[in-house]
């Protein structure tokens, strides 16, 4: 988030400063942080909402988050442009879900949907070439050049990939807990803190939304 903040506040030559009032989103599967920025690059407001990921949510669910969590917190009624950088936003058909959901609630002159990795790369590298990595609920990396991701190994999500991520570490921890393979003191502490049964864990993992 700090990287994105530095990028969009300090890079006065970036395209977004052609617009009067910008809303910039950095979204993972767990949380979305929205930055409201004026034409001079001043940060006016920072808002947190639930995460938005088009692999797990429909247009209507995206719209619900925007309507009930973002819009009530916005200090102004008019946004000129939205730049959304999000997990799962690497495919046009998935980007369309986020875009449609946002536009159901907010009326803007323009909107761009890109991957969270591109947002991180632009924040880290600016106009220079370089390697950018992100590590959160998921994990990803790329070689960045000329404002775009030039090379990337697909992260494949928490089931097939996302090595080293919070989801991967959490999956390992939960698996060891259920198999009673944790050190006894850790096993006891986990059980006492979360008080969750094997049936509940399996239900949340295989039946409920956002298993990661």
Name each model feature, range by range:
Residues 71-112, 124-125, 206-208:
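Short beta-strand-loop/turn "lid" adjacent to the catalytic site in phosphate-handling enzymes
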Residues 45-78, 89-97:
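N-terminal phosphate-binding loop and adjacent alpha-helix
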Residues 32-36, 122, 133, 139-144:
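Short beta-strand scaffold segments in enzyme catalytic cores
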Residues 22-26, 81-83, 130-134:
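Short glycine-aspartate micro-motif
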Residues 22-64, 149-151, 155:
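Short glycine-rich, Thr/Ser-proximal phosphate-binding strand/loop in the N-terminal lobe
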């Amino acid at each position: 988030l700090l990287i994105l903040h530095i990028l969009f506040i300090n890079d006065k030559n970036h395209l977004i400063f052609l617009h009067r009032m910008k809303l910039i989103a950095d979204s993972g599967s767990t949380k979305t942080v929205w930055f409201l920025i004026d034409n001079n690059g001043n940060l006016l407001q920072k808002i947190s909402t639930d995460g938005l990921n088009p692999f797990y949510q429909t247009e209507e669910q995206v719209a619900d988050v925007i309507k009930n969590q973002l819009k009530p917190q916005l200090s102004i009624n008019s946004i000129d442009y939205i730049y959304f950088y999000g997990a799962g936003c690497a495919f046009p058909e998935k980007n369309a879900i986020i875009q449609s959901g946002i536009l159901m609630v907010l009326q803007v002159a323009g909107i761009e949907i890109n991957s969270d990795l591109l947002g991180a790369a632009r924040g880290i590298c600016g106009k220079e070439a370089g390697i950018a990595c992100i590590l959160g609920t998921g994990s990803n990396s790329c070689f960045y050049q000329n404002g775009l991701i030039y090379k990337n190994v697909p992260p494949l999500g928490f089931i097939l990939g996302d090595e080293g991520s919070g989801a991967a570490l959490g999956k390992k921890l939960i698996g060891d807990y259920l198999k009673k393979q944790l050190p006894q003191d850790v096993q006891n502490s986990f059980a006492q803190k979360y008080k969750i049964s094997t049936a509940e864990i399996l239900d949340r993992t295989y039946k409920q939304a956002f298993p990661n």
